[in-house]
Amino acid sequence: MADGCVIKRKSYVFEVTLKSEDAYILEAFLQDAKGTYSIKDKVVKYKNNNVIYKRLIISDSEFCRNLIKQGVVPNKSLIANPPLLDDKYKRHFIRGLLDGDGHYSKSRRRITLTTTYNLLKYVLQAFNADISLIHLKNNIAYFDISKNYYLIIIYLYFNAHYYINRKRESIFAVLHRYGKDM
């Protein structure tokens, strides 16, 4: 839900765009899905520089209809609601949401998530942890996690196969700083 969108053209298409260094996620997805689509470069102008991203476009109406049922719709960032998932998939969804629209502080146990209020509630309920909401403005939620930080990281990353490596490394650096290693 974080870095992908469904677009209505002549038919529905699903597009996901990631930093070039994270393209391995797209490759793993295609391999597991046994997809024949290709990953292409997308050049984006950023601060007077051309930045190359990797983009996957899937033109499959049934696939797109299933995503729409789960809330992946145009302009979803403004209206996103939690998907209807079995409990065994919630942590994977939340990890993907945080990988795409979240930030893990390198200096303290803080997570920042840019999302709707309904999705934020969903995440906080899944964590069931001692969390203080610091700020919620313009769909940006900052929250500190104190004593349950380690348990939340285990919940998100234990036996996980898909994640953004650079985000995981950032989290593990914080854990190491606090004397907790996985």
Predicted segment positions?
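Internal intein/HINT superfamily modules and their associated LAGLIDADG
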Residues: 1-182
